[in-house]
Curated annotation (Swiss-Prot):
Recorded name of the encoding gene: rplK
CDD domains in UniProt: Ribosomal_L11 (cd00349)
Function in brief: Forms part of the ribosomal stalk which helps the ribosome interact with GTP-bound translation factors.
Superkingdom classification of source: Bacteria
Name listed for the protein in its UniProt record: Large ribosomal subunit protein uL11
Family the entry assigns: Belongs to the universal ribosomal protein uL11 family.
Presence of the UniProt keyword Cytoplasm in the record: no
Gene Ontology cellular component list: cytosolic large ribosomal subunit
PTM description: One or more lysine residues are methylated.
Alphabetic keyword roster: Methylation, Ribonucleoprotein, Ribosomal protein, RNA-binding, rRNA-binding
Length: 141
């Protein structure tokens, strides 16, 4: 018989740096999950992507066991990395803070494709360009 799901927990955690401190500890503690076990598994799985923010969806079962799925880093984080910026513009309509090329947008779209609800690469590129626009990043090309 299948285990009964008692909840989902969605978090964004730096790759390879999960620890029991907030926000991880309290979120998992509420559901009774073994926090250290999750941290060990997550850090081992995301070791290669160190420095990136990784969204994770944790499924908690009635016997306090869990599984988790890691997703691709948020488009905003990838855009900031490509544009070599610390943060986006506070006023994206007025102040442009950086630029990315069409090639960089395509690279990000290819990486994000599994997590986006786009039918083709062109649609995914449009989504990434919209994110860039809302951050005050100009897309050239």
């Amino acid at each position: 018989m299948a285990k009964k799901v008692i909840g989902f927990i969605k978090l964004q955690i730096p790759a390879g740096a999960a620890n029991p401190a907030p926000p991880v500890g309290p979120a998992l503690g509420q559901k009774g999950v073994n926090i250290m076990e999750f941290c060990k598994q997550f850090n081992a799985k995301t070791q290669s992507e160190a420095g990136m923010i990784i969204p994770v969806v944790i499924t908690v079962f009635s016997d306090k066991s869990f599984t988790f799925i890691t997703k691709t880093p948020p488009a905003a984080v990838l855009l900031l990395k490509e544009a070599k910026l610390q943060k986006g513009s506070g006023e994206p309509n007025r102040n442009k803070v950086g630029t990315v090329t069409r090639e960089q947008v395509k690279k990000i779209a290819e990486l994000k494709m599994p997590d986006l609800n786009a039918f083709d690469l062109r649609g995914a590129e449009e989504m990434i360009m919209g994110t860039a626009r809302s951050m005050g990043i100009v897309v050239e090309g």
